[in-house]
């Protein structure tokens, strides 16, 4: 039974997901439905957490909008997510960057990874 489930999940997983890590700045384009119109909306910010669970994988992106911190959790293989583009690579030493929630200004900056 689990073999069938794994096969179905593998078919539904996206193949074009770029490799990104916590600390990277990404732009996620998401389909938004407003009334009868459907359009793409971009959300750009720093990846603060990644949850790897196959088809159920998710990642959290944080950005500052009008001086207010905004976090959004995206399902990696969701049909709502159109594309993910890595804008900048960040050098961090932790897997979860929740400490950025308390930081503002220069202390919230992340060094750029050179490789």
Curated annotation (Swiss-Prot):
Family under the similarity heading: Belongs to the bacterial ribosomal protein bL19 family.
Keyword entries, A-Z: Ribonucleoprotein, Ribosomal protein
A Gene Ontology biological process term: translation
The protein's name: Large ribosomal subunit protein bL19
TM annotation in the entry: none
GO CC term, one of those recorded: cytosolic large ribosomal subunit
NCBIfam families documented for this protein: rplS_bact (TIGR01024)
Function: This protein is located at the 30S-50S ribosomal subunit interface and may play a role in the structure and function of the aminoacyl-tRNA binding site.
Signal sequence residues: none
GO MF annotations, alphabetized: structural constituent of ribosome
InterPro entries, A to Z: Ribosomal_bL19, Ribosomal_bL19_CS, Ribosomal_bL19_sf, Translation_prot_SH3-like_sf
Annotated organism of origin: Pectobacterium carotovorum subsp. carotovorum (strain PC1)
Pfam families (alphabetical): Ribosomal_L19
Organism phylogeny: Bacteria, Pseudomonadati, Pseudomonadota, Gammaproteobacteria, Enterobacterales
């Amino acid at each position: 039974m689990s073999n069938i489930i794994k096969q179905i999940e593998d078919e539904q997983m996206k193949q074009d997901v770029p490799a990104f890590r916590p600390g990277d700045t990404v732009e996620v384009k998401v389909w938004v439905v407003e009334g009868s119109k459907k359009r793409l909306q971009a959300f750009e910010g720093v990846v603060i957490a990644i949850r790897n669970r196959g088809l159920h994988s998710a990642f959290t992106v944080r950005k500052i909008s009008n001086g207010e911190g905004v976090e959004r959790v995206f399902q990696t293989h969701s049909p709502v997510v159109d594309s993910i583009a890595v804008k900048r690579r960040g050098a961090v030493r932790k897997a979860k960057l929740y400490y950025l929630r308390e930081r503002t200004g220069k202390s919230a900056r992340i060094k750029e990874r050179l490789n």
